[in-house]
Amino acid sequence: MLSKKSEGEGQILTFFSMASAVGKTVLAVNFAAALAERGFRVCLADLDLQFGDVCNYLALAPEQTLYDYSEANEATRNAAAFVTPTAFGFDVLAAPKELDEAFIMNADIVSSAVNQLQAAYDFVILDTTTGFSAINLSLLELTDVLYLPCVVDFIPSIKNLKCGIDTLHKLQFDWQRVRLILNRNKAETQISVKDVEALLGRPFQYFIGNDYRGVTQSIKEGKPVVLTDKDSRLADEISNVFSSELGEQEESGGFSKWFSGLWK
């Protein structure tokens, strides 16, 4: 369960995948918006360094990026000074604008930035690139909760997911900190979800339906669907994920929050 840590130590929520086009960035953006709406200080870091799309999804034109942070004086720089505010109550640490700027990034630079953001925000959401790169491995070490969005309408994606889960086990990553999210649930496919769960040896914790039109419209407008189309099925299903993670329980027509430690 998600909860605010002690002052100066925010939670790090990482969105990670073993395949492209599984909805990772859409979910990361909407998680950031939902947490910010609830009054938390939130920063979304776009760590898909070469081809990050967070700013495109939010219609942002950042003046500073992670590259500018890397070029600043190492002794005095603070990642929180390089973020871009959004109209939705959270900040974004943007990915480098140019490919050659992304090439100089390394695990030390990225981890340092994330640690500094952790000291300034209640939640730091990481939208990572695909695969087990050196940078991603360093981010896994910092992660409090790891979200793995996936789809089951494409066999190579299932194969990659199985490989990724096996790798997490080899890395001895604490499975209590992992959330499997089936995106595009009930899309047209001949593949059984139960068969996929049997292959993975793990059940999906969350299911999000297939709404290509809703996602496309959200990206076109540069607005998170959980804020702009709250009555849609897509927004409702995404909201169910973070409501469950926050431990929100419906009482008397509203929501009450209760917080406890992540794992006791």
Q: Over which residues does each language-model region extend?
A:
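Acidic-aromatic/histidine active-site loop/patch
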Residues: M1-I12, K170, R177-V178, L182, ...
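Phosphate-binding loop that captures ATP/GTP phosphates
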Residues: L35-V92
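Conserved nucleotide-binding/hydrolysis micro-motifs of P-loop NTPases
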Residues: L49-Q50, E98-D100, D153-I155, N185-E188, ...
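Cytosolic-facing regulatory segments adjacent to core modules
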Residues: A72-F132, L137
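Conserved catalytic-core segment of NTP-binding enzymes
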Residues: D108-S112, Q118-A119, F123, T128-Y206
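Beta-strand-loop-alpha "switch" segments that mediate conformational coupling across diverse proteins
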Residues: R184, E197-V225, I238
